[in-house]
Amino acid sequence: MMSKMGAMFVLLLLFTLASSQQEGDVQARKTRPKSDFYRALPRSGSTCTCFTSTNCQGSCECLSPPGCYCSNNGIRQPGCSCTCPGTG
């Protein structure tokens, strides 16, 4: 009787460890593509200089095209950059 209970405990332990390992693998696969996606996005303002105040209201000096303006980079990258028509 004790050997049956011991065998059941070992099987339960092995099953628990195997399922938790699979869950960790799924989590690792979920996070990686998101960072690759953000890294692949084109960064606007690479040929521009943004002369700004603290709230990103200023002028841009760009090689091309005309009509660029200063804007916030966003929550993940604080600061300002030039946003130009057709560059996103």
Swiss-Prot record:
Cell location: Secreted
Propeptide: 21-43
GO molecular function, one term: ion channel regulator activity
Main location: secreted
UniProt keywords, alphabetically: Acetylcholine receptor inhibiting toxin, Amidation, Disulfide bond, Hydroxylation, Ion channel impairing toxin, Neurotoxin, Postsynaptic neurotoxin, Secreted, Signal, Toxin
Tissue distribution: Expressed by the venom duct.
Modified residues (Threonine amide): T87
Name recorded for this polypeptide: Alpha-conotoxin GVIIIB
Protein's job: Alpha-conotoxins act on postsynaptic membranes, they bind to the nicotinic acetylcholine receptors (nAChR) and thus inhibit them. This toxin shows high activity on alpha-9-alpha-10 (CHRNA9-CHRNA10) (IC(50)=9.79 nM). It also shows weak activity on alpha-3-beta-2 (CHRNA3-CHRNB2) (IC(50)~1 uM), alpha-6/alpha-3-beta-2-beta-3 (CHRNA6/CHRNA3-CHRNB2-CHRNB3) (IC(50)~1 uM). The toxin binds to the same or overlapping binding sites than conotoxin RgIA (AC P0C1D0).
Keyword ATP-binding assigned: no
Keyword Plastid: no
Lineage: Eukaryota, Metazoa, Spiralia, Lophotrochozoa, Mollusca
PTM annotation, UniProt: Contains 5 disulfide bonds.
Family: Belongs to the conotoxin S superfamily.
Cellular-component GO terms for this entry: extracellular region; host cell postsynaptic membrane
Domain notes from UniProt: The cysteine framework is VIII (C-C-C-C-C-C-C-C-C-C).
Signal sequence region: 1-20
Additional remarks: Negative results: shows no or weak activities on 5-hydroxytryptamine receptor 3A (HTR3A), and alpha-1-beta-1-delta-epsilon (CHRNA1-CHRNB1-CHRND-CHRNE), alpha-3 beta-4 (CHRNA3-CHRNB4), alpha-4 beta-2 (CHRNA3-CHRNB2), and alpha-7/CHRNA7 nAChR.
